[in-house]
């Protein structure tokens, strides 16, 4: 098989991140220098992000039977690269005080980003599985990076065992679908799995097992048990990656699968996904209400956010608006999560033991760091879906899709979930403006806004407010992110 120049250009983000992995490995082997390796990582991710412009100029193309590069894959690749860039930036000050090898952290983030990019372009069940594994395996190490802390090690082992079980379900489900259809590419699955075939027992069993595997990766109810513990145990920069790139890349691949294979049109699959979405929205929001740890709270909140996105996924075959909804919602979720976890990272760095993740640590933050508490307030308002923030447009789109698709009970769940969510987001905001306790020690540097992590947090908050007030540029961008059908 000969690879043309157009195919090479289409693969450029993947190739650039792969090359960065090799360069960082060689730098570690030659001489350990934390600053040099962090800089190499950030430069590599930025070049990969810039290369998306040239990928767009080259136009949509099938690189191999496994990968399809089009507007949709470019959009998700961009989001994964932004999340990886933010994770590396937040990790730098945290790693400054880390007593063991620091440089491998960036290596693991880059390999996970490679998996995310592969998932974004996946057009075949094989590339879907390889992408998921390439994304998950480095996360085992990243979650347990603070291994001297019992909670981090416990989170890593828990995530590893449950992830291995979920991957085996996913693989077995793919095997059953292949046994029934004789093909593994998304487009061929769409042709071979016609409506009368979808009720075959073997096929339903395969689909069920795939839903279990993918539900775990997206932390949907009832496969969400790992989420709060892993978010709490993982270092704050790793929780950032888990909440953003880890979810966005998998959701992008699932979107493509549902677009090409008409599984979502099957009534039985719609009902199962509807029940999962309903349970995720209510469970995530109700459980978050009683949390006093901000990382656990954001973990439960992410379960609810993926439940909202599932409403659009159910309607993706029949409603053009659903694709746009997912795009707008994910951008809002990305920037809000980067900002919220970024504040936790800034409060926690450098590595000295547990993160500053209890709500008590944020009590009276406004009187010490007014701009940082304003950023946190904006992020909470956006996650709650309050007008004039980007999160509001995401929720509005989800409700519009739910009404258009006549998913009344799910639309009701979104409204109820948002009302419950407002309560616990307000709890975080109120604690920021209470009287500060005397004995509370804060690690945040006075010049936090001039650090790289501070700049990322400020850019995220500006993006949330700008697109919340003037969403047209974002909507135009999302409309370009069309799949090649």
UniProtKB/Swiss-Prot annotation:
Keywords (A to Z) from UniProt: Cell inner membrane, Cell membrane, Membrane, NAD, Quinone, Translocase, Transmembrane, Transmembrane helix, Transport, Ubiquinone
InterPro entries, per database record: NADH-Q_OxRdtase_suN/2, ND/Mrp_TM
BP GO terms, sorted: ATP synthesis coupled electron transport
Gene Ontology molecular function, alphabetical: NADH dehydrogenase (ubiquinone) activity; NADH:ubiquinone reductase (non-electrogenic) activity; quinone binding
Subcellular location per the Swiss-Prot or TrEMBL entry: Cell inner membrane
Domain of life: Bacteria
Name of protein: NADH-quinone oxidoreductase subunit N
Organism: Pectobacterium carotovorum subsp. carotovorum (strain PC1)
